[in-house]
Amino acid sequence: MTRIGLLSDTHSYWDDAYLRHFKDCDEIWHAGDIGSISIIEQLASTGKKIRAVYGNIDGQDVRGQFPLHNRFTVEEVTVWMTHIGGYPAKYNPNIIAELTKKPPMLFVCVHSHIAKVMYDKSLQMLHINPGAAGK
């Protein structure tokens, strides 16, 4: 089983607690609003696989390294991670067509800074908003 450390909205804020929380993880996923590429560098220093997307506050240093949307598969689970995705019945209009055409099993998105986990019955996918890790 792959263990995932999930965070978002660090806004350039580093907390050593990230390393404690993620020490037993196999991968670390950052769902955008990283703020500074130094956050990624510190996460990468753990030697764990890093997956990320850029958010609306991220500059070119982050946007040059990570996509707006990241679709991938982990242990046969299809994942779509993006920063501004919306919520069940209120998805971002920019992604709704693709989301309904080819929904992932797991949809990770943020922007509200409030951690939530919901199951979208209509698309049969788990929706996770990790909330804000920064200040």
PLM segments and residue spans:
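Beta-strand-turn-beta hairpins that frame and shape the catalytic cleft
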Residues: 1-5, 71-80, 120-127
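N-terminal active-site segment of His-dependent metallophosphoesterases
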Residues: 1-50, 58-69, 76
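Active-site neighborhood of phospho(di)ester-bond hydrolases with catalytic His/Asp-centered motifs
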Residues: 6-8, 27-33, 51-56, 81-83, ...
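Short active-site segment of divalent metal-dependent hydrolases/proteases
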Residues: 12, 36, 86, 114, ...
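A broad, structure-centric signal for solvent-exposed, well-ordered loop/edge residues
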Residues: 13-14, 41, 60, 81, ...
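Flexible, charged surface loops at secondary-structure boundaries
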Residues: 21-24, 73, 100-102, 122
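Conserved beta-sheet core of the metallophosphoesterase superfamily
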Residues: 51, 89-135
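Helix-adjacent hinge/juxtasegments
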Residues: 51-97, 101-102
